[in-house]
From Swiss-Prot:
Residue ranges annotated for the SH3 domain, each copy included: 1156-1216
Originating species: Candida albicans (strain SC5314 / ATCC MYA-2876)
Phosphoserine modification, residue list: 366
Feature: compositional bias, Low complexity: 1042-1065, 1117-1129, 1233-1268
Post-translation changes: Phosphorylation of the TEDS site (Ser-366) is required for the polarization of the actin cytoskeleton. Phosphorylation probably activates the myosin-I ATPase activity.
Protein's UniProt name: Myosin-5
Biased composition (Basic residues): 1-12
Amino acid sequence: MAIVKRGGRTKTKQQQVPAKSSGGGSSGGIKKAEFDITKKKEVGVSDLTLLSKITDEAINENLHKRFMNDTIYTYIGHVLISVNPFRDLGIYTLENLNKYKGRNRLEVPPHVFAIAESMYYNLKSYGENQCVIISGESGAGKTEAAKQIMQYIANVSVNQDNVEISKIKDMVLATNPLLESFGCAKTLRNNNSSRHGKYLEIKFSEGNYQPIAAHITNYLLEKQRVVSQITNERNFHIFYQFTKHCPPQYQQMFGIQGPETYVYTSAAKCINVDGVDDAKDFQDTLNAMKIIGLTQQEQDNIFRMLASILWIGNISFVEDENGNAAIRDDSVTNFAAYLLDVNPEILKKAIIERTIETSHGMRRGSTYHSPLNIVQATAVRDALAKGIYNNLFEWIVERVNISLAGSQQQSSKSIGILDIYGFEIFERNSFEQICINYVNEKLQQIFIQLTLKAEQDEYVQEQIKWTPIDYFNNKVVCDLIEATRPQPGLFAALNDSIKTAHADSEAADQVFAQRLSMVGASNRHFEDRRGKFIIKHYAGDVTYDVAGMTDKNKDAMLRDLLELVSTSQNSFINQVLFPPDLLAQLTDSRKRPETASDKIKKSANILVDTLSQCTPSYIRTIKPNQTKKPRDYDNQQVLHQIKYLGLKENVRIRRAGFAYRSTFERFVQRFYLLSPATGYAGDYIWRGDDISAVKEILKSCHIPPSEYQLGTTKVFIKTPETLFALEDMRDKYWHNMAARIQRAWRRYVKRKEDAAKTIQNAWRIKKHGNQFEQFRDYGNGLLQGRKERRRMSMLGSRAFMGDYLGCNYKSGYGRFIINQVGINESVIFSSKGEILLSKFGRSSKRLPRIFIVTKTSIYIIAEVLVEKRLQLQKEFTIPISGINYLGLSTFQDNWVAISLHSPTPTTPDVFINLDFKTELVAQLKKLNPGITIKIGPTIEYQKKPGKFHTVKFIIGAGPEIPNNGDHYKSGTVSVKQGLPASSKNPKRPRGVSSKVDYSKYYNRGAARKTAAAAQATPRYNQPTPVANSGYSAQPAYPIPQQPQQYQPQQSQQQTPYPTQSSIPSVNQNQSRQPQRKVPPPAPSLQVSAAQAALGKSPTQQRQTPAHNPVASPNRPASTTIATTTSHTSRPVKKTAPAPPVKKTAPPPPPPTLVKPKFPTYKAMFDYDGSVAGSIPLVKDTVYYVTQVNGKWGLVKTMDETKEGWSPIDYLKECSPNETQKSAPPPPPPPPAATASAGANGASNPISTTTSTNTTTSSHTTNATSNGSLGNGLADALKAKKQEETTLAGSLADALKKRQGATRDSDDEEEEDDDDW
């Protein structure tokens, strides 16, 4: 992708970059990156679309790797794959939840929180209803995923200050423990298996999207579990919680004992479950009831019904003398009747007898009481218990919905969370399993329609280039179960069997078995097996038993039982759980009662319609084993789930499709702010149609055409990274607008502050004088008439500022120094300089040092390399109170000897050189008035305690002596003549303009660059010039030399002066004063500037010519300098051109081929560089290839600013045509004035060179010279400035250069250095 990702977002490291071999070279290769200890190491790939091979086995291998590394989540595009770890991994903490707030899925590892964040973000951003479909077999972790999504949305969407919204949030979260207790149970495959379906819909307010209501839809509770379970399974959790930890008042009221007492909780021989704390869960259930708002009376009624179910289950039967069923223990029946508030005799009759009514047309028939046998009586007893629990559960759901209804505020936006039973295959599968698996087939059909089929159909409809993918459509299986015509399905056959033989269940089962042959006659997904049948589901083949299916499909209580509960004196039973209309519906012969298959079919279709109206998210859960043990991974079982879930097809679809699509209108509505052509100040300004606006937006955002396609009505974005980048730019638009307003305000405040400070400073100076200049005058007075002065020291603008390194600042280079060496005092003076050190058996050396002065001490700090790392160390600490005298010479040098009263090997006398020596002397004298200042032609100090050494100073005129420095050799310092000792600083020059330069408030970066280029002021803390330091006078770039042979070359004439159109008008904008563009210097001035940069004074290095840089040959040097440094807004007075020079410089030779550092390759194709660590390639561009590793090459741009890996097949070796450089131009011939200037001993490079090239021909012949020298000088100054301002990293390199370049003061050792 060719655009920048969302700001502050880290790229997921999904691919390994080819490792760079540790070859030789000084660079040492790519350094190892810092490891983030908070981020786990990536194992496998986090998105299956990144797999190199798309097979079921490859998907399984990747999931296995991640599972064993406790990484259970993996993506397929936007689909989340979750593998149940069967243990707590600690990944659902509040701290981890906060990491996903406001983050897109590529910034953070795959997680269910990322899916929840995406849903909530899309709800707010696009106003679309959201839903998440969680699918997988039983025990794969669907319920846990639903709980965590609810937890996340409740946390990120709720305003804690709003009591009503916080209450809704708490109630939504409380539904989890409540419905788990009443609707989940332990099965062979899952300790917390959902035995019902649940669709939770959270409704949000308009505008701020706070949860204001919720609604739960229940689907098909498995009520058969109340009365019977398979061995090693359990009843619903609430029965074990209630019987184990029942409150004392309920024990007395309802006679509750342990779970082993009751048949319904002990028959399966599984009372306790590892990892399940029934006591804690029961407290959570009670707390949830209180949060939801159940009154104490309602809670009593709930537990009363649970107790009645348990005691009904304990009713047992014996045969009487006629073989009919009789109650074994009347006390049990009596206690159950007490709990139901009915007559015990009526309860007994309803269980062991059946009432049959006959009718003859319109005449009333007879009523018979038919006794039941033990099997029939047991079925009636169980039907009563199942009916009570089923209706109780449905009432709890309705009661919860009443509490969750919240305010009456209208809301049209919602997030739905579907937690429904997973696909089931048992040894014996009956009606419950066919209903459960039917619902899962419908969910699979939704997944196919919404992800696979709909995606391909949309591409065809929108005329998008697309490669069709084959997939299995399970609609044929859904029709096999639910269809009514033309071929009736299983549910229709069940209903018809009940209608044919409604009185006899066994007869109805036989009728159903006969009709199966017609149901699946032409369906290859169905097989009839005599009393059983097989359906080939998407998840596997399942064998179902016919026996008992018709009876379970009736889903209606017997009339005797309804009449029983209608006689109850408890209004909760006869009005709430069993309202009177139930009995009326049962006796109405005009309408067939609704069967269980009708209910589940109707609910499933409503669910499909609801989900189809939402933007779906998908979580596909996988169960890794059947043992429910952590770190147990069954490859065959997981591979089977991968196949029936269709993960491979999903990956193939994702790899070939588009991640995002939107209508043109909606896309423009969302992103028109990103283009200046479509949006201005938040308003839509485009006048064209929507598709042209889309093109303009994508063009302005630099989205390459390969990242999107335009259909007939929609725009398709290929990768999610592109969408995230667009969203990020949109988010930043408003931040940028806010930042613009903030900048304007801060600019206004800064102008006021600066103006106030200017007035305050001016008043202080007028009233009390300038303290820095006063201290300067004090320091100069100490040396007045005794020592020659440097010209830079006598500038009127010179002031003694003290802390030149900024040690007293809160941050920066100076603060870095004192923190490193541990100086805790306030710094009075700080500067860089040199010290003369004598090593054992070697000559004295001038070494760079840092000098810091506090109230008590002088700290001399050395920069040393320890294991290739820069360290600052205190070399000497000199107490100011112990200083005896300061020794200086009478000349203009910068040497100072600090002599102590009692020097020691650790605190010796020092001989130092620094530009601010006068200020240092003044500071020390002020701190210790008893210090003596000795000034003479020699300086004496003790190199070692008791060993005095004398340094002699002389006036020299050799070429090795710099104008503004000195030359040290064998104890003698040679220096040029300075200003007279009686020199004084002139008054500070007045500003050239009284107006404030407001440009610095609007474009500070440009103002600095312009100021630096146009008017440079002396910087006193710069290192001593090269010659002054005694270093080799090798220039930073080669001085142009006269070529021996060259070919004349025609060059286009170029004038170094700006044209009239290039000079900005002063009146264009009166509110701002733009910096006047400085014209390029004349060729002769550039040569002079180059020479000045190599060894001349700092002042000469920073001279910038004015509009007309040509000076008169007879004009004094000082006049020329003043002219070139003037930057007033007034026009420069024109001067007469100098007479033409007879001899001109020859033109430059043709370009010569420079051999490249590395082999050069040309890019044959574009490469986007989307892989981490890679570099993008642009077709037909030439690059360096420094290393080849297999199919990858280490590529570097020609300017060596970027480096990374790219496919070597994208490159082709080529000749280095792009590396040609022109030969340096020849220097101009020296004029006669240079010789006379040199004879006088004072050269002025500006005045002597500006008179040589004044004619048009000189400008023409040196046009190439102008650009070459200008670029070289600019590069040299830029490199030098960068070297001076860099901290630790650059200091290390600078120190190595200095140590390598430092030379001995003499080839022979000094005579004093041989003392042992």
